[in-house]
From Swiss-Prot:
The lineage of its organism: Eukaryota, Viridiplantae, Streptophyta, Embryophyta, Tracheophyta. GO terms for molecular function: structural constituent of ribosome. The keyword Chloroplast applies. This is Small ribosomal subunit protein uS15c. Part of the 30S ribosomal subunit. The gene is rps15. Its main location: plastid.
């Protein structure tokens, strides 16, 4: 499923590299890579800090997308298998 979304986003890469969906997708890939790294290296605090920063950036982009276009937000959440944002 992730590979399929990667392929579809790669095809659109030339014209949409700066789109919110592509940015969230690339942050999600980085998050998954860092998570697997931290499972092996639990005390790598610099990587933990980097992971928290990327999580914050992705969360801000998802908040922006949910406010601007709820349908695109729901589709992206479903494609990338991410939990929805907590509402206050």
């Amino acid at each position: 499923m992730i590979k399929n979304s990667f392929i579809s986003l790669q095809e659109k890469k030339d014209e949409s590299r700066g789109s919110v969906e592509f940015q969230v997708f690339s942050f999600t890939n980085k998050i998954r890579r860092l998570t697997s790294h931290l499972e092996l290296h639990r005390k790598d605090y610099l990587s933990q800090r980097g992971l928290r920063k990327i999580l914050g950036k992705r969360q801000r982009l998802l908040v922006y997308l949910s406010k601007k276009n709820r349908v695109r937000y729901k589709e992206l959440i479903h494609k990338l298998n991410i939990r929805q944002l907590k509402t206050r």
